[in-house]
Amino acid sequence: MAKLLQSPPKFLPAEWYIANKSQYHRAEAQRSRSERLVAESQRLVEEIEKTTRKSQSDVNKKLEQRLEEVKFWKKELDDKLEHLVNETEDLLTYKIRLERSLESYKEPLHITEKCLAYREKRVGIDLVHDVVDQELQKEADIIHGVMNLLTRTVEEATEQIRLNRSAKYNLEKDLKDKFTAITIDDICFSLNNNSPDIKYSENVVRIEPNSVSLEDWLDFSNTNMQKADKQLNNSMALKTLVDQILSQTANDLRRQCEVVDTAFVNGLKETKDARNKLADHLAKVMDEIASQEKNIEVLENAITQQEGPAKVAHTRLENRTYRPNVELCRDVAQYRLIREVQEIKHNVARLEETLAQAQIQLKALFRRQLALQEEIQVKENTIYIDQVLCMEMRKSIPPRDGDDHGAWEGGIRAEAIC
């Protein structure tokens, strides 16, 4: 207790000086360290502010560059989309042309097949597989081939339109995403330290797991562009093919139509010539019938005219049998009368034989007359079928110029055949 109440120890003056000096030094050292820290802090603040400004400026520049890059690709995609849309609309028009062309071949095919059916109604020897039949069948085969080709081309156009729309969908989706990205980056680019809607966000300093690399991003847009380019090229090639098909088929059908019409004209001329020759022969046969009938009449009259002389000769011979006794002489007159009767009998036999031959010839002429009349009727039937039924019906086939390359009158023109 006594120790606790003792007064504190006293120091020597030297100790006092030393203690004060020590305080001075420690204070000076502390102040110096503090000053260095203040200076370092100021330098650090300035450095960080400069770095922050530089980083923010760099980010702004990168955002601006990114915006320009995305906008560039968006414009490229926009242009490609517009081109693809226009090309698809063109292809739709071409498809309509193909469908109308396909439809327009039905009536000519019907006419050709009907001509073939009509010509099956020819009769007799005229039911021949002639050049007209061959060319009509060839025309029908060509039209069938053209229709099959057009049907396949319509299917190709339909598929190409589907592929174009698929590429269009991909472009539109890419454009939509790029528009959203541009909108977001525009907002980000416009932000500054004084913007009212800036804030801290949790867990944003990260790489999204579903994000893609810049190379993947470029590949994606490039792929969409390449797919669109491929469909554009395919569409343009298909349009060129359609133009060629429509032009070539028009020319083929026009040429074949001309061949068929020429065959009809030539065949009709040949049939008419045959009919006219038959008519000439019929007229000659008719004249010969009249001549033969007159000849028969002359022969019959000649036979009749021999009856008088025959009766006279017979009467003379009979009367001379009544000569008496030696007067019943075989004189010259008697022999001449006998010879006269024999001559008349022989002449009548000759006349009757000639008459029989004339009657046979007349019957043959009548048969020939009937055959010629029937054959002329066969020719008339053929002429009626070819000229009245077929050739008149073929006039309803619309003409085709063969130079259709897609320019339709009034925007859309029905396709013709020949």
Swiss-Prot record:
Cellular compartments annotated: Cytoplasm, Cytoskeleton, Cilium axoneme; Cytoplasm, Cytoskeleton, Flagellum axoneme
Record key words, sorted: Cell projection, Cilium, Coiled coil, Cytoplasm, Cytoskeleton, Flagellum, Microtubule, Ubl conjugation
Domain of life assignment: Eukaryota
A family per Pfam: Tektin
UniProt PTM: Ubiquitinated, leading to its degradation. Deubiquitinated by USP16, promoting its stability.
UniProt-listed InterPro entries: Tektin-like, Tektins
Principal cellular location given in the protein's record: cytoplasm
Protein name in UniProt: Tektin-1
Source organism (scientific name): Rattus norvegicus (Rat)
Taxonomy of the source species: Eukaryota, Metazoa, Chordata, Craniata, Vertebrata
